[in-house]
């Protein structure tokens, strides 16, 4: 049996009627969320401030919006600028969730969580998973990090932050605009205006269409794919190698259609296989009855490495943002650098 992932209710985004039970529960969720936030704002509950800068990359909707590609790009930029970044994450869906853990590139995703393992695999920086992000930040500082990047955690108010980056999907935005469970919102849409940076994930949009899709004060993020890395090891192939071929495309992410569309844009014949987000794969899940190449996202690949073979490929995703975004971010961060 395949491990179950998380499915997004269709009525969050497709305009279909919201069940009455969900409508009745949404105000309760909204009230609890507002009360908790007010408690931190008014000092009834205390923030904890770490002695190094803290950057939170998050969203106000449930599910994926492109936070992890941005986190990876951010870590690489910070390292190039002379910082020693570390990443703190909750590690959604992992086993022994109450147990803090250092995540390595070879940590099983069941133990470390999909996104933390992917970040460790791609960047090599210290990655700490812990329900308590304050404790995770302290551990990263002890490990020598001088800036903390939180992958998700916009709503984890106990940890004070210096920079907030909201990531929103350009296609789905805020869905039906309702709070969980009637809609995708963790917090009201107005919360987004309080973030220091709003990044709009445009997928494979080009520079011209990116500029048109983003409003004032929003930064476009384009996603690019160029190659495919065999899971069994060996030299990567350019995606042009698969042009004109049929392939099985596997995506267990929040918005799998985006991955399929990106492959099709490269002239690849896609046989799509959409799985739930955070799917725990078993070998039989990828037995499609043919020897066509299997191309998958890197988030899926880290969960399939144990049974990878010569025709399973991970397709690296690269996030690209305007140079002005990085200038604005590093300028803000440099002001926080200790003398």
Curated annotation (Swiss-Prot):
Q: Which GO terms describe its cellular component?
A: plasma membrane
Q: Which residues bind ATP?
A: 61-68
What sections of the sequence does the record tag as coiled-coil?
Answer: none
InterPro entries recorded: LpxK (IPR003758), P-loop_NTPase (IPR027417)
Q: In which pathway does it act?
A: Glycolipid biosynthesis; lipid IV(A) biosynthesis; lipid IV(A) from (3R)-3-hydroxytetradecanoyl-[acyl-carrier-protein] and UDP-N-acetyl-alpha-D-glucosamine: step 6/6
Key words of the record: ATP-binding, Kinase, Lipid A biosynthesis, Lipid biosynthesis, Lipid metabolism, Nucleotide-binding, Transferase
What Gene Ontology terms for biological process does this UniProt record contain?
A: lipid A biosynthetic process; lipopolysaccharide core region biosynthetic process
Give the EC number(s) under which this enzyme is classified: 2.7.1.130
For this protein, what reaction is catalysed? a lipid A disaccharide + ATP = a lipid IVA + ADP + H(+)
Q: Which GO terms describe its molecular function?
A: ATP binding; tetraacyldisaccharide 4'-kinase activity
What highest taxon heads this organism's lineage?
A: Bacteria
The record's family statement is:
Belongs to the LpxK family.
Function, as annotated, reads: Transfers the gamma-phosphate of ATP to the 4'-position of a tetraacyldisaccharide 1-phosphate intermediate (termed DS-1-P) to form tetraacyldisaccharide 1,4'-bis-phosphate (lipid IVA).
NCBIfam families associated with the record: lpxK
Which protein are we looking at? Tetraacyldisaccharide 4'-kinase
Taxonomic lineage is: Bacteria, Pseudomonadati, Pseudomonadota, Gammaproteobacteria, Lysobacterales
Q: Identify the gene encoding this protein.
A: lpxK
């Amino acid at each position: 049996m395949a491990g179950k992932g998380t499915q997004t209710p269709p009525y969050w985004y497709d305009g279909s009627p919201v069940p009455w039970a969900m409508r009745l529960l949404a105000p309760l969720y909204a009230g609890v969320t507002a009360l908790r936030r007010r408690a931190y704002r008014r000092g009834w509950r205390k923030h904890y401030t770490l002695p190094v800068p803290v950057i939170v990359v998050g969203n106000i909707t449930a599910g994926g919006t492109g936070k992890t590609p941005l986190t990876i790009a951010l870590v690489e930029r910070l390292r190039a600028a002379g910082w020693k970044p570390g990443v703190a994450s909750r590690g959604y869906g992992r086993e022994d969730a109450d147990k803090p853990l250092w995540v390595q590139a070879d940590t099983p995703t069941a133990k470390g969580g999909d996104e933390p393992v992917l970040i460790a695999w791609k960047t090599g920086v210290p990655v700490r998973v812990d329900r308590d992000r304050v404790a995770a930040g302290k551990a990263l500082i002890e490990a020598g990090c001088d800036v903390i990047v939180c992958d998700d955690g916009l709503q984890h108010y106990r940890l004070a932050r210096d920079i907030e980056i909201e990531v929103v999907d350009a296609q789905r935005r805020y869905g039906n605009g309702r709070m969980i469970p009637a809609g995708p919102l963790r917090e009201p849409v107005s919360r987004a205006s309080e973030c220091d940076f709003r990044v709009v994930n445009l997928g494979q949009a080009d520079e011209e269409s990116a500029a048109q899709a983003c409003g004032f004060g929003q930064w476009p993020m384009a996603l690019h794919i160029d190659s495919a890395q065999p899971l069994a090891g060996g030299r990567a192939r350019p995606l042009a190698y698969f042009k004109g071929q049929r392939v099985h495309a596997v995506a267990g992410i929040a918005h799998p259609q985006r991955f399929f569309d990106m492959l099709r844009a490269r002239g690849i014949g896609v046989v799509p296989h959409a799985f739930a987000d955070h799917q725990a794969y078993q070998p039989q899940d990828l037995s499609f009855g043919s020897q066509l190449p299997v191309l998958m996202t890197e988030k899926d690949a880290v969960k399939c490495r144990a049974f990878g073979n010569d025709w399973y490929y991970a397709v690296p995703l690269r996030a690209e943002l305007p140079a002005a975004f990085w200038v604005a971010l590093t300028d803000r961060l440099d002001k926080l650098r200790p003398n």
